[in-house]
Amino acid sequence: VCSSDLLRDVFTYDPQAPMIFSSGIFLWLFVAFILVYLLLQRRTTARLLFVTLFSYYFYYKSSGTYFFLLGLVTVCDFFIARLMAREAIPWLRKAWVVLSLFINLGLLCYFKYTNFLGETFASLTGGTFTTMDIFLPVGISFFTFQSLSYTIDVYRRQITPLTSLLDYAFYVSFFPQLVAGPIVRARDFIPQIRRPLFVSNEMFGRGIFLIVSGLFKKAVISDYISVNFVERIFDNPTLYSGVENLMGVYGYALQIYCDFSGYSDMAIGIALLLGFHFNINFDSPYKSASITEFWRRWHISLSSWLRDYLYISLGGNRKGKIRQYANLIITMFLGGLWHGASWNFVLWGMMHGVALAAHKFWMTLTGRKKGTESHGIHRFFGVLVTFHFVCFCWIFFRNAEFSTSMDMLKQIFTTFRPQLFPQLVEGYWEVFALMALGYLLHFVPDSWERACTKTVIRLPLLGKAVLMLAVIYLVIQMKSSEIQPFIYFQF
């Protein structure tokens, strides 16, 4: 019975339990995967085929039969890029890239925005709209953007198209970043595909460090403070005092950072163990002294994608200051919409867009040049203001209803009751200990993290294994009754 249950868990899709990096089934399967991967070390094509098949299996365990969408996008964009590269007539080249945009954004709009657009249109016209039961495939926003970056780069003649469908399928479906990023650029990843497999001791050690730290951030810090504190506050903000609501906001800021950067760390670490390099996706974003700096540090793969393929296409900063500010707001409006088909995400994106435009205006007004860093007390206050603005925006990001966000702000500004703080810490001491640890680890100097990475690299193989097992044991001890999916799975 146990073996049949295990086989069922391995081969069937359970929408209530999608496969994620922090699940026990993935950790065991990954060990088996690595063994086969190493056996195919010198057989490049067989290894690429094996990884691609495993990636499709991984996506099947996340979204069921909707893995065919991944195949559809892959096949369409592979042949579109090949045909576009051969075409010399400009308008025909443009027609091919428009077709790629239509296919990818069409799929994205149907699965993600049909109900949102229908409800919005109905409310504007006074009509009625019956919500359709449309399943949102996990990570569709990520793999469509990744595939689009390839066809757009081919259109711009920045890269040459691949000649192997297998290589392109490997690029689009590579499982470490498939369902929640980072969004990997073709120009960075494709040159690595056919390289001889080589994992240096430094790559292996850094990979282990990133997997361990990512697992700790996600499964220990993020999940625990979410289930035991943050969700309670956001679900019923009017039941709690202002100080409790504020601590809930600080908790959510840490939760979403640890959740998303934890996934990115694990993705980058797993890729390193397989011999591939991804660019960093988070760079201590809450250390930012301005909102512009924040977006250079937060979800770097998305912000750089929006910059290169949307902001610059709109004209960037080449059409005058007013146009630049408008382009920033439009880009962040669409960036907010990318996160979800809901007005709270749109509002969140607009707030960040207006803040970015205001910061650019301030830089122009004061004559400060791009890249100029503040220091000392100026930087301290810059970090403080930026962090609290980001936290303010997280309130609207987290709450689906605008009224709930206003209730939370009302509690913070009218019933603060700071005298309750010692009692709050005493009642939730485990949560506050983890929050303190999480923020401490975030704000330590970068040199400390580099030193920790070097320490893990120098550990013998047995030491690395003990470290992994210790963190896995800690995760098991602290896990909630249900596996908490990564927040960005829904995007």
Stretches found by the model and what they are:
Residues 5-490:
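Membrane-embedded transmembrane alpha-helical bundles that form the catalytic cores
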